[in-house]
Amino acid sequence: MANMTNKITRRSFGALALGSFSALALAACGSSNTSGSSSSASASATGKKVAPSALPSGMGTTTVDGEFPRTVKHFRGETTIKSAPSKVVILSTGQLDGVLSLGVVPVGAATAGDADLVPTYLKTKFSDKSAELDKIAKVGKRTDPDVEAIANLKPDLILINNTNKKDELYESLAKIAPTVVTEGTGINWKQDFLLIAAALGTTEKAEKLMEEYNTKAKSVGQKAGSEKTFSFLYASADRTRIFAKSSFVGSICADASLARPAAAQVEKTSIDLSSEQLDQADGDYLFYGVQGGDESKLTGEALWSTLKAVTEKHAHSVDSDMFFLNAGPAAALGVLETIEKAL
């Protein structure tokens, strides 16, 4: 079957409510729903989902940037960090994006399954730090961190999120170094970024990055207008899903006031689609990724060539790491830039 697509590539408490944030992203897995809802959408319906843009009350720190020691309240209690961290280990989704965006290259990181330790979009974004990125040590997988390998790095700060609820793991990590726990899941990417900044003592820099993101989101939204719908589709080994309101890309669309297909306007991270339901992912613009890079898993489907986005050459293959598998300011800006190029 002809592949009628275009391929786009790209190269705490002290943080107040950030009035410039839009009050409006990707869990490791989404909810499944195979009911046959209509694929039509109201062009004015953005399917907005509020993505927390400030830390929950009482979390973070009241200590000013650059001052140590500092005590940070987080999702597993509170942790005192004695000096500015220089040997950080990150163990969860979005945290590599977050620390690099704040100017810190970690000494160790966990991977998502068999994925690359440093995703391509981060290698491109932070190419000036390529030598340092190459030295990051692998410390197991996000679902099963290697505690011994972490200890051997002698870190002075460990970051993990609260989706890993093993008390014994947190206790083991806290014995190695000060450990700060973010909430996790893509929809919480903004508040988690602020919590990372609170631990590093770089809240002002984080706020400036979010202001840049908000400005870009507004600009892309104005350029896109309110009449076009935007859809995001990802195929892995055992499922194909459209990303919905409670996802990383869903939060970005809400911030940019981009309209979504009806199937994406649900309070879930994603919706599983069968081959017969692929038309529910249609929109004026379709951004898709395939695990392993074999796009025929989608483009070879019988309904693919019937999609409006495909026939009008508005179906774009994108970097899955950036769109669907990570969540942070660098990824968010990359998603917006990719959408803007497609318009």
For the regions a protein language model found, what residue spans apply to each?
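Bacterial Sec-exported substrate-binding components of ABC uptake systems
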Residues: 1-94, 205-230, 291-295, 303, ...
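Extracytoplasmic substrate-binding proteins
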Residues: 78, 167-236, 329-343
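A short, structured surface patch at a secondary-structure boundary
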Residues: 96-146
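Extracytoplasmic ligand-binding site segments that recognize negatively charged/polar headgroups
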Residues: 113-119, 165-168, 183-195, 231-251, ...
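Short helix-initiation/N-cap motifs at beta->coil->alpha
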Residues: 139-146, 266-274
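Proline-aspartate-enriched helix->loop->beta-strand connector
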Residues: 154-160, 178, 283
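Alpha-helical, coiled-coil/dimerization segments enriched in small aliphatic residues
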Residues: 242-271
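Structured C-terminal subdomain patch of bacterial secreted/periplasmic proteins
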Residues: 281-343
